[in-house]
């Protein structure tokens, strides 16, 4: 059995407080939702972060600016 859905959706404003790695944001009807996972190094980091010296320690995680 096939169902055909025609939709017209108008969104004047939308606010999303947070998106996590397991979030699903859907507008309208989805016949199926397929899993997709992407890992991106958006900070330009080239090596692991150094270990913390004390619990609750605040450290800078700015990527190095050296060019290679």
Curated annotation (Swiss-Prot):
Induction: Expression is sigma K-dependent and negatively regulated by GerE. Keywords: Germination, Sporulation. InterPro entries: GerPB. The lineage of its organism: Bacteria, Bacillati, Bacillota, Bacilli, Bacillales. Required for the formation of functionally normal spores. Could be involved in the establishment of normal spore coat structure and/or permeability, which allows the access of germinants to their receptor. One of its GO terms (biological process) is sporulation resulting in formation of a cellular spore. This is Probable spore germination protein GerPB.
């Amino acid at each position: 059995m096939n169902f055909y859905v025609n939709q017209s959706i108008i969104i004047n404003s939308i606010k999303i407080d947070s998106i996590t790695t397991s979030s699903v944001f859907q507008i309208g009807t989805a016949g199926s939702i397929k899993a997709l996972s992407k890992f991106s190094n958006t900070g330009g980091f080239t090596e692991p972060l150094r270990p913390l010296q004390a619990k609750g320690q605040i450290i800078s995680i700015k990527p190095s600016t050296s060019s290679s």
